[in-house]
Amino acid sequence: MMAAASDSCLSLWEGSASSPNRQLTPEAVNCLTEALTEDVAVLRLIRSDPRVKIFMAVSVLTPRLARFAPPPPKLTHTAKCAVIMIYLTRPKALALQPKQFHMLVTFNKASVYSLVVRVKTKPFPVGTQRFRAVFQDPESIGLPSDIPDPAAENIPTEINDRLDVSNFATPAQPPKDKYDCCVLAPGVWWSNANKAIYFLQMDVALLALCPAGWKARGLGIILGRLLNHQEGCATCRFTEHSDPLNATADSVATPESCLCWAPCLWRKAHQRELTVEGDRYLFRVLFMDAVERVRLTGLRRSPKITANLADLVVGIGPHGQQIPVNNAGWKLVALDADISRLIVCGCYALRYICPPTNSKHQPSSPDEYA
């Protein structure tokens, strides 16, 4: 059996944290359900039978999620994410209303919380047995005498679903609040108003000019391949990711699955004029002629979401002359809120930049969630 709580949760409980009948405070139970709704992108269904539904989720920690996660034994990159198990049941003794469930939530196989909550779900647009969930109207309830052990559950280990953001990008115009944004990478923005990612995407026809097998079309990723130094470093190697889609703390994702990829000297040293050190042939998808250096503009100060490639990059030729950009080959696209949340919840860099919303989730239409 699993330990029911850790000493770090003392402030979460009404009364003593060691009491067998302890319950979350009203403030804590509301914080928990808001965190599970807003800071977790997707639930993976592990088991479903007439008695119980079991879901698993993985997300980079936010301040809300961190309140409920136990202290990590080691400060590794996986210690920055929460591994969550959710058990939904409908005990007759609780006389629950329709769509109400008794819910046990475990964090990192160590801390467990009990509540009654209204649950609404809808299929997630990527993969099978994946769901987006909204948790509402929570009520704290005492822990049951028999607490399930997540380690005893048969967790699927196959990684059978991958995210290619190009498949979910739709043509867009700069939003009305185009200045209300933060820069995630060159040509990639988080819209604070829409809670969604916008980015400049290369036309699919230009893939023919890229290295064999290349799929990524985001501007930041292309610039990274063009400008990153050959010997590489941790920033170049696309580390520090988890995999919320497959509910695993370690990710084997490729750059096209996350839009954080960018020239490493821009990210870690804030350099804006960079020498071409990577795949020099990629200049053909960005500029009308060969370039020796690339200047990144309009990124850190007064950023705005723009559809114009020339607002973001300047090519400099071998004699110091400016090289025109291939503006026709790039279009502004947007990801919907669910896909944007999935990317952010799996990336340590983006989670730090994109603050989780503090507002309670309201479905855009009554039929959005079942």
From Swiss-Prot:
Q: What is its main location?
A: virion
Q: What is the superkingdom listed in this entry's lineage?
A: Viruses
Any GO CC annotation of this UniProt entry: viral tegument
Q: Which InterPro entries match?
A: Herpes_UL16/UL94
Listed A to Z, the keywords are:
Host cytoplasm, Host nucleus, Late protein, Virion, Virion tegument
Question: Where located?
Answer: Virion tegument; Host cytoplasm; Host nucleus
Q: Which family does it belong to?
A: Belongs to the herpesviridae cytoplasmic envelopment protein 2 family.
What is this protein's function?
Plays a critical role in cytoplasmic virus egress. Participates in the final step of tegumentation and envelope acquisition within the host cytoplasm by directly interacting with the capsid. Upon virion binding to target cell, a signaling cascade is triggered to disrupt the interaction with the capsid, thereby preparing capsid uncoating.
Subunit record text: Interacts with cytoplasmic envelopment protein 3 and with the capsid.
Protein name stated in the entry: Cytoplasmic envelopment protein 2
What is the native source organism of this protein?
Equine herpesvirus 1 (strain V592)
